[in-house]
Amino acid sequence: MTARPSWAGRGIGDALSSIPMAWVLRAILGVGSAALLYLAWPVAAGALEAQKADTVMFELRTRQPLKLPAVQAALQALDRAVEADPVAGRRLRRAELLAGAALAANLPVSNEQRAAWLKKAESDLEFGLTNDPARGIAWAQLASVRQALYGTSAKVVAALLMSIETAPMLNTLWPPRLQLILDNWRFFTSEERERIVAHVAETWRLSTDRRWFADAIRTPIDELFLRHALGDDPNARDELEKLIMNAKKK
């Protein structure tokens, strides 16, 4: 006597009695795998294209001289990567190269091309940061791109403040941040100035090499700002004075 299946008499047994359950499971898994492959392919294709820009990105980040043909090929690869998978990370990566190439003085390109690269970088950064706002480096890049395109402004300050709020203790970002702060000081509100002064003072306190503070000074007003930020600490004032004197000897 054949044992009754445990599911018999409950509907599913009658409906599927002629279909082996293993086949059904394989069919479902096959559909799932095909769907997963369909969804994953743009990500994989985008990653493959993005990898083609790795060498140029490394050269940019290590401040090596960029070569125009390599930059153009890398940008084309990143364009394809964004087209295949237009997520925040892809566009932020492309923005980094666009901005770096636009501001690379050694590249033999026109000012019109540099401006076009910067505008595309601005668009990528704004898209990327809208979708992934916790990126202090990208906010600093947006601040510098806006200043390069439009000059000093409140829009530069807005991006700069977001950079500080999202990555306040990232020391490698502070030299360019300080330069942007000094350039755009008149666009900060009174409340924002108090916050910035506190951040600069804290960064001074935590820094082991403070030469970059003096290197950022280009006008007497810049020097006054730094002296104000360091407050009444006589040791800090004396050290800053020595750093300024050494910077002037260069």
Where do the protein language model's features map onto the residues?
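Amphipathic alpha-helical repeat scaffolds of TPR domains
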Residues: 44-62, 83-108, 132-145, 171-183, ...
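Terminal alpha-helical segments
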Residues: 41, 61-77, 172
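Hydrophobic membrane-insertion alpha-helices, especially the h-region
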Residues: 22-43
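Non-cytosolic head/periplasmic domains of membrane-anchored proteins
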Residues: 109-182, 188
